[in-house]
UniProtKB/Swiss-Prot annotation:
Deamido-NAD(+) binds at residues 381, 410, 522. Keywords: ATP-binding, Ligase, NAD, Nucleotide-binding. The active site is at 52 (proton acceptor), 119 (for glutaminase activity), 157 (nucleophile). Its EC number is 6.3.5.1. This is Glutamine-dependent NAD(+) synthetase. HAMAP family: NadE_glutamine_dep. InterPro entries: C-N_Hydrolase (IPR003010), C-N_Hydrolase_sf (IPR036526), Gln-dep_NAD_synthase (IPR014445), NAD/GMP_synthase (IPR022310), NAD_synthase (IPR003694), Rossmann-like_a/b/a_fold (IPR014729). It catalyses: deamido-NAD(+) + L-glutamine + ATP + H2O = L-glutamate + AMP + diphosphate + NAD(+) + H(+). GO terms for biological process: NAD biosynthetic process. The gene is nadE. Pathway: Cofactor biosynthesis; NAD(+) biosynthesis; NAD(+) from deamido-NAD(+) (L-Gln route): step 1/1.
């Protein structure tokens, strides 16, 4: 954390970039009250700003349908208001008003609720479905209050992506606008956000303090990266992404400009660095918030499980991670050696349980029915399911969460065994294509000294090792081709003809698209994993399992 010298200022704003877990109303309220005291007493702030729906956490989803939950949030706001002696606080909460609920932010001062703003633009796309829960107040007022002679307005998150809410707030007299957010991370979002802030400040002339929540919530990871922008369009360097921290700024009213006072620099803002930190934060918070102190994973000596192991160690510490080597008759000696090498390097306990007894037992049990058949993918899947049973048994007996190691490419085309390698409670690589997995592994090996993933893991051909001399490319196109097609089809919703026009072979495109369609049922049963792309599998890509449409 860096601090600049305290200088004369018109307004000091303390922006609370912290994690406010969904549903933890009492915990969030206690922390908000503590943060109010810190902002007033430690930073001598005039205003303390909290994220969107800080009291309830975001997104509360169907908790908002429970009257008791809404009443609890309202009671919490009253408690918080009572703590606002000598400081102004802006706090997000779900406001119940008869039969409707608003996504609201209230201005609290000297023990009372001075004003409340109700969000006008409710996102209803991708991961958002706010119109399921919230209403827009057609008669809602602008929220502008005076703090030390400065006219301060409030709008909420999505409101900033439309010109009208900010314009109306400025027309009502605001020169400084506070924007509480709960905006989840995806690749490229920081540049998009900074461009938006520059545009909005230039067109309105208002200065903007943009606060985003931080932390993992199921498949969503909120990155923080809060930022301020001067009235002339200058966007200051952001606070660190995925870090709980204060961002304290001094606002000069006459100049409509900010001077950062307390902040944490973001450091490496490369795409790989941000994606890594998103996954690690998502994994850490999923475990912590759901009561898992340790994790298990099957370590094969391949790239996917090696990357998940490194992520788990970064998230939880090596002492809380147990890797399990599950060799079969088809496992190469190199695979065993690489698993052992990585665990030694990371200080992770490695257990070895051969799957041959379980596999042979299943073959014997099924033998009478399989007598007149030839071995095929069924026998391959029995190996994967044997591994899944063993990992889940360890979790049941000793506690801890099993991590699955599949990637987005595999989930897309069904190159994963349901109840086998898909067993587990969290999928760190779920929104990373195989080519991105390789890229992240190479990037992580450049950070912090010795490689955390053996280089031979990265360089060897990917293989499920379920039969002799098997490689992934026996069943799939090369990953650079496969991922190029998948990105266009899944992330960008391009048609078959569009993808072929981009240079991909028509028969390959048709094969890949058919696999995607056929494996919707598998994806519906997959564990959650952190969203890092514009279009992740899960709540933002809602295709029916039973689907008669085969058009492109």
């Amino acid at each position: 954390m860096m601090e600049s010298a305290v200088t004369a200022h018109t307004l000091r704003i303390a922006m609370a970039q912290f994690d406010f877990p969904v549903g933890a109303v009492t915990q969030n309220t206690d922390r908000i009250i503590e943060y109010i005291a810190a902002a007033r007493d430690e930073f001598e702030a005039d205003i303390v700003l909290f994220p969107e729906l800080a009291i309830s956490g975001y997104p509360p989803e169907d908790l908002l349908l429970r009257p008791g939950f809404l009443a609890h949030c309202e009671q919490a706001l009253a408690r918080i208001a009572a703590a606002t002696r000598g400081i102004v606080a802006v706090v997000g909460w779900p406001q119940s008003a008869g039969s409707v609920v608003y996504n609201a932010a209230s201005v609290l001062r000297e023990g009372r609720i001075e004003a409340t703003y109700r969000k006008r633009e409710l996102p209803n796309y991708a991961v958002f479905d706010e119109r399921r829960y919230f209403d827009v107040d057609p008669d809602g007022d602008n929220c502008v209050v005076t703090v030390k002679g400065v006219q301060v307005g409030v709008v909420i998150c999505e409101d900033l992506w439309f010109a009208e809410p900010l314009a109306k707030t400025v027309q009502a007299g605001a020169e400084l606008v506070l924007v509480p957010n709960a905006s989840p991370y995806e690749r490229g979002k920081h540049a998009q956000r900074d461009a938006l802030l520059a545009e909005r400040t230039r067109e309105s002339g208002a200065a903007i303090a943009y606060l985003n929540v931080v932390g993992g919530q199921d498949a969503l990871v909120f990155d923080g990266a809060s930022v301020v922008a001067d009235g002339d369009g200058t966007v200051h360097p952001a606070a660190a992404a995925f870090v709980d921290q204060w961002l304290v700024v001094d606002y000069a009213a006459g100049e409509r400009s900010f001077t950062p006072v307390v902040w944490v620099d973001d450091g490496d803002e490369s795409m790989d660095a941000l994606a890594w930190r998103a996954v690690v934060r998502g994994l850490k918070d999923y475990c912590g918030k759901n009561g898992f102190r340790k994790v298990w994973l099957g370590l094969s000596g391949g790239i996917d499980s090696a990357l998940v192991l490194a992520m788990a160690v970064d998230a939880l510490g090596g002492e809380n991670v147990t890797a399990v080597r599950l060799p079969s008759r088809y496992t190469a000696g190199l695979s065993n050696d690489l698993a052992d090498e990585q665990c030694r390097a990371l200080g992770v306990k490695l257990e070895t349980i051969a799957i041959e007894p379980a596999f042979e037992g299943l073959l014997a049990a099924l033998g009478p029915l399989f007598a007149d058949t030839q071995p095929d993918i069924t026998e391959e899947n029995l190996q994967s399911r044997s591994r899944g049973v063993i990992l889940m048994a360890l979790s049941n007996k000793f506690g801890g969460l099993v991590l699955t190691t599949g990637n987005k490419s595999e989930y897309a085309v069904g190159y994963a065994t349901i109840y086998g390698d898909m067993c587990g409670g969290y999928a760190p690589l779920k929104d990373l294509y195989k080519t991105e997995v390789f890229g992240l592994a190479k990037w992580r090996n450049t950070v912090g000294g010795a490689p955390v993933i053996p280089p031979a893991v990265i360089s060897r051909p990917p293989s499920a090792e379920l039969r002799d001399n098997q490689t992934d490319q026996d069943s799939l196109p090369p990953y650079d081709v496969l991922d190029g097609i998948l990105y266009r089809y899944v992330d960008q919703e391009q048609s078959r003809d569009d993808i072929v026009a981009a240079g991909y072979a028509a028969d390959t495109v048709e094969h890949v698209l058919r696999l995607v369609r056929l494996n919707e049922w598998k994806r519906h049963q997959a564990a959650p994993g952190p969203k890092v792309s514009r279009r992740a599998f899960g709540r933002e890509r809602r295709y029916p399992i039973t689907n008669g449409y085969s058009g492109q």
